[in-house]
Design a protein with these regions (language model features):
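Structural and coupling elements of P-loop NTPases
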Residues: 1-190
Length: 190
């Protein structure tokens, strides 16, 4: 699907990466935003502890955003709102925040989910900020918000291993690799 994704500019299969920041490993999963890929979305949402809702500063909430956010809120996931592309020009911040709040209300967000933090960003320029008035110099404000707003994973480290595999990859040196979330127990290197 990579060729189709590049050609159409959409995400079909989830992409997973990890960032080590301030002593914490943050796993980030880019999931399809469209209902046509609902199976992929549901599979991935079972692995995450919270979601980042990316909103285009100029275009606002996209129609495909509704599907994924509705699923995430229905599963009780906490959302962190990232207003991206704030470098592209003027936009009405108040109107955009109202649009986001209406979306959360329409989708049945509970009180905890409705109390979401907003981060302003320019992914293209590589910065994030907690206020629109100042441009950041890096993505630290976004990563700090992830650590403070998204709940840490829960699980029983002492129980038998329970691993939810969500993706299978291949490496020519290692072979097949199962990528997933450890719900119980632990895995040792070696």
């Amino acid at each position: 699907s990579n060729d189709i994704e590049r050609e159409r500019g959409i995400t079909i299969l989830a992409k997973i990466t990890a960032i080590h920041y301030n002593g914490t490993k943050i796993n980030i999963i880019d999931t399809p935003g469209h209902a046509d890929f609902g199976g992929e979305v549901e599979r991935i949402l079972s692995m995450v502890d919270g979601v980042l809702l990316l909103v285009d500063a100029i275009e606002g909430c996209m129609p495909q955003t509704r599907y994924v956010l509705k699923k995430a809120l229905g599963l009780g996931k906490k959302a962190l709102v990232v207003i991206n592309k704030v470098d592209k020009g003027e936009f009405d911040e108040h109107e955009l925040r109202e649009q986001i709040m209406e979306l959360f209300m329409e989708l049945g967000a509970n009180d905890d989910q409705f109390d979401f933090k907003v981060i302003y960003a320019s992914a293209k320029q590589g910065w994030a900020s907690t206020t629109l008035a100042e441009h950041g110099t890096n993505m630290a404000p976004l990563l700090d918000a992830i650590l403070s707003e998204i709940p840490a994973p829960e699980g029983d480290l002492e129980g038998g291993l329970q691993l939810l595999i969500c993706n299978i990859d291949y490496d020519e040196y290692v072979g097949r690799i199962g990528i997933g979330k450890v719900n119980r127990g632990h895995i040792d290197v070696g």
